[in-house]
């Protein structure tokens, strides 16, 4: 079972990529992969593509989170699924970085991809239909890997932390408080605090 969520990145693409590539979260970057870019230079690679884009949009990249139910998938398999999801969704047109965070009780993937494609330099259109497409692809991959799938409608409208608390039995308010405290301690600016909270799946 995997929960998916996506949001746009309008600034600090480099900080977002640095966060998802954190060695402490990715087993010293063992679970970091990329396509049509290097994780170390992805922000610059994205900018080069965006500079040639025809559309004027504030969205520089998109951050997709794919979180699995605790204990259902190994680190290695989760990372494979993340790469497969990125490949199926982006069809070889967009540069991306995919990482798997293994430092908590729930394994989850982070996929950050450039908002403009490398071929025609058109922008990715984020809408309700595109999100449903992401969820459909994720569910199909879960089935292929013999993982459970979220029952349609059963999780509708739930935020990421609410879904997660249902999976591991933790109190969602306590978890939110912990996440806020962690991000406050880790961030040096308010913008960075917002970035860290969004990376954890919160809508702000």
Predicted features by range, described:
Residues 1-204:
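N-terminal nicking endonuclease/strand-transfer module with a His-rich metal-binding environment
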């Amino acid at each position: 079972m995997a929960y998916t969520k996506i949001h746009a990145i309008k600034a600090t693409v480099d900080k977002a990529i640095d966060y998802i590539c954190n060695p402490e979260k990715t087993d010293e970057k063992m679970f970091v992969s990329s396509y049509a870019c290097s994780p170390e230079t992805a922000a610059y690679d994205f900018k080069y593509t965006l500079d040639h884009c025809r559309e004027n949009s504030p969205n520089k990249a998109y951050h997709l989170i794919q979180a699995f139910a605790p204990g259902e998938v190994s680190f290695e398999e989760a990372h494979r699924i993340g790469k497969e999801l990125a490949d199926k969704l982006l069809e070889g047109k967009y540069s991306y970085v995919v990482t798997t965070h293994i430092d908590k009780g729930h394994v989850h993937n982070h996929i950050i991809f450039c908002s403009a494609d490398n071929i025609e330099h058109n922008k990715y259109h984020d809408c309700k239909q595109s999100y449903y497409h992401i969820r459909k692809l994720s569910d199909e991959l879960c089935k292929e890997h013999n993982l459970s799938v979220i029952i349609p409608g059963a999780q509708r409208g739930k935020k990421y932390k609410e879904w997660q608390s249902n999976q591991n039995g933790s109190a969602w308010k306590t978890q939110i408080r912990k996440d806020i405290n962690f991000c406050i301690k880790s961030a040096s600016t308010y913008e960075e605090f917002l970035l860290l909270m969004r990376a954890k799946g919160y809508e702000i």
